[in-house]
């Protein structure tokens, strides 16, 4: 929850409304199941040192990247870092159960409640509070661990804005949670009545007065609070804000009328101080005041008792109202003595007012006050926990796993009730659906030009997806972002395969380009490798072509392609792109390693493929190799090349088994290397090498669409505000 509070604080202090566009904030929780399905290694998160540690839960601070990606155009915002919080287990319980110093106050069951990441994301809206449902929000989570060392990696999770904005809130489903917390608190006060401060006992009595006679309920109430059970068994109904507001207004009016009646009664029957001590009693006051008075005050108060005390619900001992012969309002037995050992009737008052405030006090405010005492102060997190909370379950379109959208009663973010100036935004999907239905088409792209212009006039935010030529992504498609990256992987892989095929056609003979001493006992192995070389190369090319995006995104080819594309854009006066993880210049090969901040002569990044069994890529990061002594290595004429040696850079520390061998040093690997110009080197065992040059031709706009997603365009700031409208790249 601390991540939600911090993000909302930044959001509240930011100028998040600029011109025709504005940003709202939505709080989400991504459970372990969804994180795992997105490719996040939870071991790195669960094994990390906790940022917070309490008697109830611990959490880890996570720096997460956030980027808004426009529908169809390929334009996107700069990456911004926001604070996320990962709770290893019991995430929803940590959200919904107040944190106090004594864990015995609330009984919880965390067995089915997994860990989760708490994060807040921006929603882009127009001036009429409408959003494009196909605009995406990218969440980038760091994934580096001991196996990758200085190489920084990450995983992306994509959400469409339609996924992040539910049609309503579910505060009505939170009633059972609050009722359970109230009952557990009352059970705690009754069990430890003799040990707790009088203030806590009095607050417990106030709370009990608000919710009625709960003794039987407390004894029958289960000691376990299971939020997962509540989520699984809710009514799946959304709130009706108009009805709720009307009921609240009616209740306020009724309470004010009752208060006026109480004031009138007090004036007609003021406190009397003439009663004998032998008939000491407490009547006509509220139950919570009576308990404190009965237990702790057997002395007569001074005669100048203020009428304010009566209005606060406390009848001082010795001051009794409505007592006299034949008076039907007497509430205590006439046999009650000054020790007050027996109370023969119940105290029935249930309303209370705290002076000097004229606002009626409700059960949640009483509960919050008690939590503040039990928790050494009222924290903002406990303020939110003690109020109503809405949890809406959603299904992530990519992973098909559940995540939660959270709204807090005391929040100004999406679904919050603190600000009536920010109603929930509405989706433009309705406008598009009506247009498609009227014209009998199944996709907005097939609408007539006249209808597209009309929609763009009504909603300018849809103008580019509908009318702009040469969009880089498919318009109005939830999978367009994934399609762009798959298209990039496919295109660059095909370029590599074509280049290698052309090189083999031009020069089918392979030469030993890396110097290794071959002994006589190696000759049988060399002969066998020679016989298998065509199959090895064919299998390697198939592995490159069929590689998944997850494998491709951690390899040498994508890193070299980024260097090539960034250098190309920068050469012709475009943006200066930087590596996302390290802030190194993107055109520097190997810039994802922290220490590579300048160009290193002879550096080539390699991927290692297995020669035994299925041919698969083995490395989880590019393997940097420096080729020494090569003269015109990439020349197409082999007789112009010289034999060279290769070494690891001094800053590279191998971790995986394959990383401990240089290219050609082991019979177990075929190594494919790339430099910043997309030159290719396939190294077989014993140093035999095939070289090729990739011809990568892509439109500049498409290159920049990919680079703006994979890289940064400015240095990381210390204070980052992703919720401020900005110019798109």
UniProtKB/Swiss-Prot annotation:
It comes from the Viruses. Keywords: Capsid protein, Host nucleus, Late protein, Viral genome packaging, Viral release from host cell, Virion. Capsid vertex-specific component that plays a role during viral DNA encapsidation, assuring correct genome cleavage and presumably stabilizing capsids that contain full-length viral genomes. It is found in: Virion; Host nucleus. HAMAP family: HSV_CVC1. One of its GO terms (biological process) is chromosome organization. This is Capsid vertex component 1. Belongs to the herpesviridae CVC1 protein family. It comes from Gallid herpesvirus 2 (strain Chicken/Md5/ATCC VR-987) (GaHV-2). It holds the Pfam family Herpes_UL17. The gene is CVC1.
